[in-house]
Regions:
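PRPP-dependent phosphoribosyltransferase catalytic core
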Residues: 2, 26, 115-178
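A general structural motif
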Residues: 29-30, 92-96, 133-135
Length: 178
């Protein structure tokens, strides 16, 4: 029998406050927030409302959507600082982007982004390595310590599915009573 852990809306609000506090403790502010469908949209929107920072959505549902993830070139260009028509008056071109998901479970979602974004925007440029963890950062409500992705900057609740298999139920998933 798999153990289940249920998060309440109060838990989610506290976790989002914690992410904002961690981000500001780093003196880092994103130009925009990206909520990953489906689980990252709600916490990204809450963080956006708390901070007044605009929010975008990106579909990277590797498990539940048979159509697969969507590539997003303009976010990759923002992350890299790519400019199609260079301007002499332009300031810093790289945008600070916070990518939010409910859980870093296996690492597949975040690893997909780290592979996809460079593939569409100057894939051979070595400076992509300076983007991740600097101007593009990752935030999750829950971090699985057994994940294959080790670059989440902001998180609130840690689990280790290699030690104890647990099924996490977020309030937007707990719809049995409807």
């Amino acid at each position: 029998v798999i153990k289940k852990h249920y998060y309440s809306w109060t838990d989610i609000e506290r976790m989002c406050v914690s992410i904002v506090n961690q981000m500001y403790a780093d003196n880092w502010r994103p130009d925009y927030i990206v909520g990953l469908t489906r689980g990252g949209n709600i916490p990204a929107t809450i963080i956006s409302n708390m901070t007044g920072i605009r929010c975008e959505a990106l579909k990277v549902s590797l498990r539940d959507d048979k159509q697969g993830p969507e590539s997003n070139l303009w976010m990759a260009e923002d992350a890299f600082g790519y400019e199609r028509e260079p301007s002499a008056t332009a300031g810093p071109l790289r945008k600070n982007i916070l990518i939010v998901d409910d859980i870093n479970d296996t690492g597949a979602t975040f690893n997909w982004i780290k592979e996809d974004w460079p593939s569409g925007c100057l894939p051979d440029d070595k400076s992509w390595g300076t983007v991740w963890g600097n101007n593009v950062r990752f935030a999750t409500l829950t971090e699985n310590l057994a994940s294959d992705f080790f670059d989440v900057q902001y998180t609130c609740h840690e689990i280790n599915k290699a030690e104890e298999d647990v099924w996490l139920v977020y309030p937007w998933e707990n719809v049995a009573e409807y």
